[in-house]
Amino acid sequence: MATVSMRDMLQAGVHFGHQTRYWNPKMKPFIFGARNKVHIINLEKTVPLFNEALAELKKISSRKGKILFVGTKRAASEAVKEAANNCDQFFVNHRWLGGMLTNWKTVRQSIKRLKDLEIQSQDGTFDKLTKKEALMRTRELNKLENSLGGIKDMGGLPDALFVVDADHEHIAIKEANNLGIPVFSIVDTNSDPDGVDFIIPGNDDAIRAVKLYLNAVADAVKEGRSQDLAVQAEESFVEAE
């Protein structure tokens, strides 16, 4: 089963929080101390919490649950996309558009427009337009792909959110809370853990740490999915008998 050890976390710098003056007092239970005015996160808390989160994500995935990866900070953007694609899940890695979850009906219309434009760009429709019209549609296509490309095949609301930075993605977390969608999130020492169902105290800036979380989550999701496929195969085998 996908798990992460304390050694893995130490090597990735998961224990380095933010400067002490930027701390959120609600994170006090997860802080070990401070060194050179930087908070040190207590990995004895983080390791079991992260592994519990991985086990739960695996369970959701084994029930065909959809996981939405959210990380719109520039540094994490590419890693978020890679991890989601790696486990055939969904992602938002540029700007979070307000209402992305709570106003799904409107988002669905924008996704339809995106898919229509994709077809037009491939079937020669763009070639029949004036240069200006073709350019405008290409720009619209790129803009929609940027914001909705990672969720265009989600087909409905996700069953869980995995968030890289609770502070930066507070709007996404609030929307998930309003809809009762469980939130799994990395929470650094400057962040508010309220609204996060599965708190993972850790560094949300170092790219090595971010990749460690994302790869472990992708592995857990893949394990859950293969468990689901194994059950399906077993059931069809029993029916065939």
Swiss-Prot record:
Biological-process GO terms, alphabetical: translation
InterPro entries noted in UniProt: Ribosomal_uS2 (IPR001865), Ribosomal_uS2_bac/mit/plastid (IPR005706), Ribosomal_uS2_CS (IPR018130), Ribosomal_uS2_flav_dom_sf (IPR023591)
Residue ranges crossing the lipid bilayer per the database entry: none
GO MF annotation terms: structural constituent of ribosome
SUPFAM superfamilies tied to this protein: Ribosomal protein S2 (SSF52313)
GO CC field: cytosolic small ribosomal subunit
Key words, A-Z: Ribonucleoprotein, Ribosomal protein
HAMAP family: Ribosomal_uS2_B
Family listed: Belongs to the universal ribosomal protein uS2 family.
Name of this chain's protein: Small ribosomal subunit protein uS2
The gene coding this protein: rpsB
